Swiss-Prot record:
It comes from the Eukaryota. The keyword Secreted applies. Disulfide bonds join 27-58, 34-52, 38-59. Highly glycosylated atypical beta-defensin involved in several aspects of sperm function. Facilitates sperm transport in the female reproductive tract and contributes to sperm protection against immunodetection; both functions are probably implicating the negative surface charge provided by its O-linked oligosaccharides in the sperm glycocalyx. Involved in binding of sperm to oviductal epithelial cells to form a sperm reservoir until ovulation. This is Beta-defensin 126. Residues 21-63 are annotated as: In vitro binds to LPS, mediates antimicrobial activity and inhibits LPS-mediated inflammation. The keyword Repressor does not apply. GO terms for biological process: antimicrobial humoral immune response mediated by antimicrobial peptide; defense response to Gram-negative bacterium; proteolysis; single fertilization. Keywords: Antibiotic, Antimicrobial, Cleavage on pair of basic residues, Defensin, Disulfide bond, Fertilization, Secreted, Signal. O-glycosylated; glycans contain sialic acids alpha(2,3)-linked to galactose and N-acetylgalactosamine. The C-terminal O-glycosylation contributes substantially to the sperm glyocalyx.
Length: 123
């Protein structure tokens, strides 16, 4: 009987020491998960630090993003993405100017009209 109680006490102590995902801290009304780093397919929320703390991020999985589009998620604008956006706008302007040439060659059915859209680095 004493060995049974001792075994039970050891298992109860070991159950508390086991590391793993027994409890996952949630954020943004149980939409996101608090993690140190987000996976590439997950979106990092700006307002998740309230629930997760300063050292963790609130990561929203891709399958839950479509169901809850109302929360605020900001993607970071980098210098590379701004340069790429400007290059795309320049290409679109060039393609729009080349449309009369496409009409004379009979390729108008393959060409769609593109308009240059300005990109601000703050959004």
């Amino acid at each position: 009987m004493k060995s049974l109680l001792f075994t039970l006490a050891v298992f109860m102590l070991l159950a508390q020491l086991v590391s793993g995902n027994l409890y996952v801290k949630r954020c943004l009304n149980d939409i996101g998960i608090c993690k140190k780093t987000c996976k590439p397919e997950e979106v990092r929320s700006e307002h998740g630090w309230v629930m997760c703390g300063k050292r963790k991020a609130c990561c929203v999985p891709a399958d839950k993003r479509s169901a809850y589009p109302s929360f605020c998620v900001h993607s970071k604008t980098t210098k590379t993405s701004t340069v790429t956006a400007r290059a795309t706008a320049t290409t679109a302007t060039t393609a729009t100017a080349a449309t009369p040439l496409m009409i004379s060659n009979g390729l108008i059915s393959l060409m769609t009209t593109m308009a240059a859209t300005p990109v601000s680095p703050t959004t």
